Amino acid sequence: MKIEVSEGRYLVDSEILNGIVLVILFTCVISSMITERSAQIITLRDKDIPVEEDKNGDDERILIPVKYPEYADRLVNLAILMRNAKLNRELIGLNVVYDDDHMRANQEKGRRLLEHVTQYAAAADVKMQTQVRIAANIANGIKHAFKEFSASEILIGMHMHKDVSAKFWGEFHQSLFNGLNRQIIMCRLMQPLNTLRRIQVVVPSRAQFEQGFYRWLERLSRVAGYLECRIQFHGRADTLALISEYVRNRHPDVRADYAEMTHWNGLPRLAETIADDHLFVVVTARKGTVSYKSAQEGLSDEIKRHFSGKNLLIIFPDQFGDAMDEMTFAQPQHTEENSAYDVISTWIRKQVK
């Protein structure tokens, strides 16, 4: 590349090379964004009528990873409200233990915790299948158990122990919902469920085109029915119309309200209406799926800023698409996701230095 066109001047110098690299990087990012957008358009075009929940074969098997005794009962209680009582299927309790020097002691703690939640569920005439699992990677352990038990969804507590990790998603939650394309419900319950007075649900646009639309809607409708509390859905008019039709036909006794919310920028205003005895539910989406939007990247910041201390469910529904590659034992518990803007900005800063 060091071809001199004159003394001290080269045909291709470092500035030209840097420019070429920047153009290649830019075109790669733009092409991936266009491909993703085109895939969403094709999906919407081919799915004029949403696929309804399979009425002939419900695959419901709820997996509940538990770790903290003070929180396990509320997770099991919520799972009991969400389950289909007519199927009378067992709940699955899971405790994952690190493969370290404290493994044996933690195994025994896990067994005692699972025995407790089994007795708690039995008091409501619900059976539980349990397992204490040893793993070097918590997310990997949950994913493997999910497949072994042929589970349909995961109900898990949100990260609340700042002494373990200061990150909003904790050590492994983000790896979990990125690595599974099945329904994952993350819970933060600050009070007993039977004291809740209202459920408020935020639904993204195009959520009706996702594979798991009717699954999460059915779960929330059951909870509202059992608690006999009012449930209010916030979203686009076309999405609310389908929700209204489903609730009216399948759960006519549920008291449901509907409020139009055209953009996720309305979350701060909605926060003013969320009381301490409300359950705030956010239906979100994974990157690359039909209902995903860039505004959802800041979901964790929005929740910390406006919904701190509130009862909360974050739902990642069943969604089309392949999950990320299987994690290995060497993979870290938590993997960060960076936007294209962050990647380009980081590269430019390095070049300037």
Language-model segments: residues:
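Substrate-engagement module of ASCE P-loop NTPases
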Residues: 301-308
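Terminal export/targeting leaders at protein ends
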Residues: 214, 299-301
